[in-house]
């Protein structure tokens, strides 16, 4: 399924073309004593989402998470740590992606930038709708993890 046989138009040799998942990052940005930052997307799919995006060639997933946080929220994040990896082929309606999710802290006031039409800081009891991609699953996993550790925000 992930590989197609093709023929070179110049030499006629057969070769394999792979259709691999695209690496992405998402970042759960904690604002102390307030909640987590979600962005309202400017582009399809429309709705609320965690800040995140595609990993650029030449950067690590950690660098991508820091860059995406800054690009979409204007926040400089600290204490970046990996949370989980999500790889459901249907997690993104545009294409098959695999995301590495990070958790980080930030201080200051976030402002929507880049692909964000708006943003907000939310607790588990004040989440906006609709939440796109599989981000509601990710957010629920995050809050359940916090609850299990007795650290609910």
Language-model segments: which ranges?
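Acidic, metal-coordinating catalytic segment for phosphate/diphosphate chemistry
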Residues: 1-26
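Residue-level preference for beta-strand/loop junctions
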Residues: 7, 21, 46, 78, ...
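Conserved hydrophobic "DFG−1" position in protein kinase catalytic cores
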Residues: 29-30, 38, 104, 121
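Conserved Nudix-box catalytic region and its N-terminal flanking loop in Nudix hydrolases
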Residues: 31-72
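Short acidic capping loops at alpha-helix termini that bridge into adjacent secondary structure
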Residues: 35, 77-80
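Unchanged
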Residues: 55-78, 86-142, 153
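Long C-terminal interaction/binding lobes of large macromolecular proteins
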Residues: 148
């Amino acid at each position: 399924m992930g590989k197609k046989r093709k023929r070179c138009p110049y030499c006629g040799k057969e070769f394999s073309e792979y259709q691999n998942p695209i690496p992405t990052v998402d970042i759960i940005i904690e604002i102390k004593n307030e909640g987590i930052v979600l962005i309202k997307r400017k582009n399809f799919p429309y709705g609320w989402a965690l800040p995140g995006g595609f990993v650029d060639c030449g950067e690590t997933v950690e660098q991508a998470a820091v860059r995406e946080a800054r690009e979409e929220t204007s926040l400089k994040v600290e204490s970046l740590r990996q949370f989980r990896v999500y790889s459901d082929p249907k997690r993104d309606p545009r294409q098959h992606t695999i995301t590495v999710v990070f958790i980080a802290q930030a201080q200051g006031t976030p402002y929507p930038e880049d692909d964000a039409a708006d943003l907000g800081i939310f607790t588990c009891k004040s989440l906006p709708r609709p939440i796109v991609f599989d981000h509601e699953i990710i957010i629920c996993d995050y809050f359940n993890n916090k609850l299990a550790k007795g650290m609910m925000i």
